[in-house]
Amino acid sequence: MKARKYNKEGVFVSEVELPAELFATGISLGAIYDAVKAENANNRQGTHSTKDRSEVRGGGIKPWAQKGTGRARQGSIRAPHFVGGGIIHGPKPRDYSSNLSRSVKKKAVLSILNKKAEENRIAIIEDVEPSSYSTKSIYNILKNMDIAEKGNVGFVVAGENQFLKKSTRNIENLKYVNSKRVVCRDILYNNNLVISESALKELQAQYSKKG
């Protein structure tokens, strides 16, 4: 499987062969589903909370007499059918976190990479290592690659380059992705992936291992 390679200015150089350890493993939609579902669950705070009738302040006395008023009998103004009353079976704080095995996470990442490669949505670029903050220079790279205006772009780089990270922050639809901490959603929900040469080697070392 091949991909287009660009220099650090975003100019096309040649087509390169993608490593089979990453891009010849097949696609498992089930693994992708499980991984994204677990990531979404782990991002939930679970702090939602409502009060039942025993927790709502007030309502300890009957609002009116049991008989003689012509109205339906009531025991408390905090009953669920009153405005301001307790909530029946409402949400309470809970932990939504979900555990995902390393093998499933690995299979999901490889499946997404294979899917993007099959759709010709992966590009390889020489390592971009700016020595200062420059949003314009990063945007010009994407513009030269002709993907600046073609939906979301995931920029996968090796490690944390603060100059590069901050330079990508103000570019709409561009997501900075650290190859050492890949999140499935960050690579799945992008139309195109731009992977630096160092990041490709990092992914190869990390995900080509068995287990």
Swiss-Prot record:
Record function comment: One of the primary rRNA binding proteins, this protein initially binds near the 5'-end of the 23S rRNA. It is important during the early stages of 50S assembly. It makes multiple contacts with different domains of the 23S rRNA in the assembled 50S subunit and ribosome.
UniProt-annotated stretches for the region Disordered: 42-73
Entry-linked InterPro entries: Ribosomal_uL4 (IPR002136), Ribosomal_uL4-like (IPR013005), Ribosomal_uL4_dom_sf (IPR023574)
Organism classification: Bacteria, Pseudomonadati, Spirochaetota, Spirochaetia, Leptospirales
GO function term, MF aspect, one: structural constituent of ribosome
Gene name as annotated: rplD
Family: Belongs to the universal ribosomal protein uL4 family.
Protein name stated in the entry: Large ribosomal subunit protein uL4
Tree of life domain: Bacteria
Gene Ontology biological process terms in this record: translation
